[in-house]
Amino acid sequence: MKNESYALEIERFFDYFVNELKLTNKSKYTIISYNTTIKSFIEFIRQYEKSVSFENLKKIDIMNFLEYKNMVLEKQSELEMSSKKLYITHLKTFFTFINENLDTDIKLSAIFKINIKVPKRTPKGVENKDVQILEEYLANIQLNNFLNIRASLILKILLYSGARRGELEVLKTKNFVADGELYIIHTIGKGDKERTLYIPKKYIQKEISYYISNDIEFIATTKSGKVMDGSQIYRFLNNTYKKIGIKYSGAHILRHTFAKSMIAKDVNIVTVKELLGHASIQTTMIYTNPNQREVQKAYLDTLK
């Protein structure tokens, strides 16, 4: 392979880069995300027909990497714009690190000045009728074994606190602090920032008591005591949705449902921003866009 030596050089820098991420207390989720992007880029370099190095790497090579990612997608679908933007961000940060540790005058970060516009979409939450099905399932689930207790706790945290999947992955029983009618939950959020979640104590008191009495450290844990990773949480949620007869996937749909329910109850947008852990209120504003049914209803109401 013509680029093998370059690929090995990138790998060497990546080992140092990962050490820096760990030393600066970046979350496991962040490190995994970088690992996925950079390893994919290294594999692309190994297969790339053009001979490249730090000295002659160009913007067109990065665009070809994005095209390569399109081709290797298991799903027959276009690579999401948000994914492209994330890959560029990861590579720019990594190559900036290389620049700081490489004896060269070349500004590698300039290669990644690629403007990728991510279309604004109104997030879809769980339909009201399906929320009722999910809540009925949670109300009737028998808390008589570990798997049922874990299922109840994970679903309630995602549905009623607005937690992200990555936040759930690192959440520990000791992070739950009782304060009046609430549990205040301290965790690490997106961008490795400290984040506070809230959930009514009455919703999960039995589950938390079980975890404490059985010395279970992590909320998302397997029966054998191992911490669940993102793919295991994803499969657990999808299996649960299928079991109760609703067609959704993953954890983020429940976060969207939480956000939309707050907006529907006229909770102040600044408060919603804090509850979701958004860095910018502009991100939160996407939940204020009315859906098509709301627009139609409002229009018909004006004709009455």
Segments (PLM) and residue ranges:
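N-terminal core-binding DNA-recognition domain of tyrosine recombinases/integrases
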Residues: 2, 12-29, 35-122, 141
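Long, amphipathic, Lys/Arg-enriched alpha-helical "connector/arm" segment
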Residues: 120-146, 163
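Conserved tyrosine-mediated DNA breakage-rejoining catalytic core shared by Y-recombinases
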Residues: 161, 165-166, 170-204
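C-terminal catalytic core of tyrosine-transesterase DNA break-rejoin enzymes
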Residues: 156, 160, 257-279, 286
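Active-site/catalytic core of tyrosine-dependent DNA strand-transfer enzymes
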Residues: 200-246
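Short basic/aromatic active-site micro-motif
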Residues: 149, 247-266
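Catalytic-site neighborhood detector that most strongly recognizes the C-terminal catalytic loop/helix
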Residues: 125, 188-191, 276, 282-301
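Alpha-helix N-cap/helix-start motif at helix boundaries, enriched for small hydrophobics
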Residues: 91, 154-155, 162, 166-171, ...
